[in-house]
Amino acid sequence: MVGVVIVSHSLKAAEGIKEIAQQMGRDVPVAAVGGTADGQIGTDPLAIKEAIEGVMGSDGVLLLVDLGSAVLNTQLAVEMLEDEGQDQVVLSNAPILEGAVVAVVESAMGHNLEQVKKAAEEAIHMEKLL
Amino acid sequence: MVETTLKIKNKSGLHLRPAAEFVKKANEFQANITLERGGKVVNGKSIIHVQALGVRQGMTINLRAVGVDAEDAVAALSELVNNKFGEE
């Protein structure tokens, strides 16, 4: 199964999103990471790298981020991975919460990294009120 | 096309977890699967669509499937809904 990493400026936000997303598939590896090394609002590339490694399996990992520096530090974290790991990690443009929910459902269905990424990014166009 | 009308009996309706169960089951079939409620039709294989339908307890939905395994798909999904997704 494709792993999912949720990167937010707030660890609480990341953990909350993880909690919701895991309702959709208990077996999918999901990691929540957020906050700076000294516990402030922000992101920490080293912590993100460790979170990626924690859920890395043979099917790869989808990365979901909130805003701004979370994107930059996640890209930095990917660069810090071993070369073979970098090929199996994809940063998603999906909205963090909706994308996480979709990604976990898709991963639980056994879809591959490309399929999971595509489905999560369709959440950009999600209508909350039909 | 195979079609059936289902009444949602589980307490929380097609909220996140049941919607996910529905979508996972729907994806086991080749058939094109749609759900309809109040004139709104959505793709039954998409979690984004199914949960957005806002189906609550007591509502009825139309389930339609088109394709080689449409009958099996409708039977399996009906069973899931009628068994309240294993909930109350």
Each predicted region: which residue ranges?
Chain B
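Compact, glycine-rich, soluble single-domain proteins
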Residues: K7-I48, A52-Q57, E87
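Intrinsic disorder
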Residues: E3, K7-K9, A73
